């Protein structure tokens, strides 16, 4: 983590699915908005950059390994982050968890002083790591992640419990062990106990503010 002043601070938060990435990102966002003002900070979710699959049938889309780096368009994410750092606005794609592909809509995203990235595979790509001013890995036990994922995917994403468990056994856990967990070595900060770790939240907020003022 650099001590120099930044015109745009990019924070990357990685870790297993349902490890608390979104919660800690949203908490930091809400608390920094109160200090920096609206429009100064934004959150970008790696999930938005899942590849377009409109050319595939629904049966084929369901079989996609969404926990492998190839499922994500990191080229576009790197391009968008580079544009934002230069001061250019971008259009972030939107992804449908029920249709398993990109939606027609995009979300305009203007340059911000602070950008929080959150996603399972962010630290596996050296280009993304190079763009980050600080990187965090959420080190939450897999059994806790599975329980959270079951609740989330059934209640919020229209999944069945059986489909969630099959996906976990087939791709989620194996890909975590192959790609996500090894990427922990690239993190500047490893956060235990999930997204409600108050000490970690306060530390990250202080670090972000320090980087903004130099």
From Swiss-Prot:
InterPro entries associated with the record: P-loop_NTPase, PRK/URK, Uridine_kinase, Uridine_kinase-like
Keyword presence, Cytoplasm: yes
Keywords assigned by UniProt, alphabetized: ATP-binding, Cytoplasm, Kinase, Nucleotide-binding, Transferase
Family: Belongs to the uridine kinase family.
GO molecular-function term, one example from the UniProt record: ATP binding
Domain of life according to the entry: Bacteria
Nucleotide-binding in keyword set: yes
Location in or out of the cell: Cytoplasm
UniProt name for this protein: Uridine kinase
Protein residues bound to ATP: 15-22
One BP term from GO: CTP salvage
Gene: udk
Catalysed reactions, as listed in the record: uridine + ATP = UMP + ADP + H(+); cytidine + ATP = CMP + ADP + H(+)
Pathway: Pyrimidine metabolism; CTP biosynthesis via salvage pathway; CTP from cytidine: step 1/3; Pyrimidine metabolism; UMP biosynthesis via salvage pathway; UMP from uridine: step 1/1
HAMAP family per record: Uridine_kinase (MF_00551)
Leading EC class: transferase
EC number: 2.7.1.48
GO cellular component labels: cytoplasm
């Amino acid at each position: 983590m650099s001590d120099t002043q930044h015109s745009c601070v990019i924070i990357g938060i990685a870790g297993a699915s349902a490890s608390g990435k979104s919660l800690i990102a949203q908490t930091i966002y809400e608390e920094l908005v109160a200090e920096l003002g609206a429009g100064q900070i934004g959150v970008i979710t790696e999930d938005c950059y899942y590849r377009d699959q409109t050319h595939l049938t629904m049966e084929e889309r369901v079989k996609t390994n969404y926990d492998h780096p190839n499922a994500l368009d990191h080229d576009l994410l790197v391009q968008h982050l580079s544009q934002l750092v230069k001061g250019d606005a971008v259009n972030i794609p939107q992804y449908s968890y029920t249709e398993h592909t990109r939606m027609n809509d995009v979300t305009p995203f203007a340059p911000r002083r602070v950008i929080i990235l959150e996603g399972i595979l962010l630290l596996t790509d050296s280009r993304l790591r190079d763009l980050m001013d600080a990187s965090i890995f959420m080190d939450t036990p897999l059994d806790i992640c599975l329980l959270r994922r079951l609740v989330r995917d059934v209640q919020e994403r229209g999944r069945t419990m059986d489909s969630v468990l099959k996906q976990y056994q087939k791709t989620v856990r194996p890909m975590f062990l192959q790609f996500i967990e090894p990427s922990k070595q690239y993190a500047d900060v490893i956060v235990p106990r999930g997204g409600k770790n108050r000490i970690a939240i306060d530390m990250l907020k202080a670090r972000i503010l320090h980087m903004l003022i130099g």
